[in-house]
Amino acid sequence: MERKVSFELDALWQERHDDEHKIRRDDHRSPYQRDRARILHSAAFRRLQAKTQVHGNSLEDFHRTRLTHSLEAAQLGTGIVAQLKKKQPEFRDLLPSDSLIDSLCLAHDIGHPPYGHGGEVALNYMMREHGGFEGNAQTFRIVTKLEPYTEHFGMNLSRRALLGLIKYPALLSQTRAVCLPKPVEHQRKLKAKDWSPAKGIYDCDKDLFDWVIAPLTDNDKALLSQMRCRPESDFEHCKTRFKSLDCSIMELADDIAYGVHDLEDAIVLGMVTRQQWQEGAASQLADCGDAWFEEHIGSIGQMLFSGKHHERKDAIGGMVNALLTSISIKVVDEPFSNPLLAWNACLEPQMAKALEVLKHFVSKYVIQVHQVQIVEYKGQQIIMDLFEALSADPERLLPTHTQALWQEVANESAKMRVIADYISAMTDGHAQKLHRQLFSSIVL
């Protein structure tokens, strides 16, 4: 049964937390063009160029960084919107503009700390008594508070852009496991799987989250923060069920970039073999139920591992196109009244299965492999060492600006959050250099 929903959006979704009253002559840009410019010119975005997406052991400069991954996700995002406008023109007025979806894809990773998941786990452990740490929560915090475009509201993005960046619309206190593991005797013994963070918004940023969702009805607010089924164990985190239409498009673009483009990195860097591809992905893709994959999976494997750049690119492009053109807008299975929440972009079931196969393959053969995990573990130790040192004597070791922020806040959790903000903003190289300065016996 189709639901008739008005696509007239309240002007409140284009509002910013601060009116600003900027001195700009003849500025005819849309709110979302301005959002995109702020993200693109931010220090947080620039730092992504020195945060690696896949930690291989190659000396080449071919590999993707968080920045190139974000650029590719942005291109995919605008491609998804373009094909949706053609495929389902009735949603044209509801779909995000190119500038808006570009903004979301460019900004989606800016909260990720150095050393990927290793850095995230380390900061979450060190912040376990102070609200935790999580990359998506940090992204929201950067754009709403930390990036110094404005004095108090970060980049001061439009409300719709902020809603689109919130992948997990609930506070961490709501999604966090009932029980946490016991702290380890020594940080070297920390197991990453025990301290993977819950997903959501920091409780200390609740006022900003409340502002974003203020135009929603009480029923929509309650539904938006609804959890999936309660986990079986008290040590497992909860996850939210819903997200906005814009966020669903951004997430698909991110997943395709991860599942397909990171696969390309792994092949070029010699991290996966053709046999691994055949056993770990090709055989399952052939049985995923999608006619395109069933017909072309043999030639895709040949082209990916032919050693010829143009053939590999053709295979990658073919898979991306097959996934992208299988996306459509579908009604959400709960009665949201706001159209931004009532509809989501989804892959057809067979293609969703295919993308999961690709993501699992990348995780198993690219992320969870020995050499990558060694780099992540090393990064985990570097981040914990830095946090321990800086929190032990912040007035001595923090840089002047960060020290001032630390002194401005009153309670211990807020002070620890300042240190987490400082460390998470570092690039891989910055963290490594500071660690050497603090702990190396070599005179610098």
UniProtKB/Swiss-Prot annotation:
Any one GO molecular function term: dGTPase activity
Alphabetic keyword roster: Hydrolase
GO BP annotations listed: dGTP catabolic process
Gene3D superfamilies per the UniProt record, alphabetical: Hypothetical protein af1432
Protein's UniProt keywords contain Repeat: no
Residue ranges of domain HD in the record: 66-259
InterPro entries associated with the record: dGTPase (IPR006261), dGTPase-like (IPR050135), dNTPase_2 (IPR023023), HD/PDEase_dom (IPR003607), HD_domain (IPR006674), PHydrolase_assoc_dom (IPR026875)
Superkingdom as given in the UniProt entry: Bacteria
Record-stated family: Belongs to the dGTPase family. Type 2 subfamily.
NCBIfam families found in the cross-reference section: antiphage_dGTPase, dGTP_triPase, PRK05318.1
Annotated protein name in UniProt: Deoxyguanosinetriphosphate triphosphohydrolase-like protein
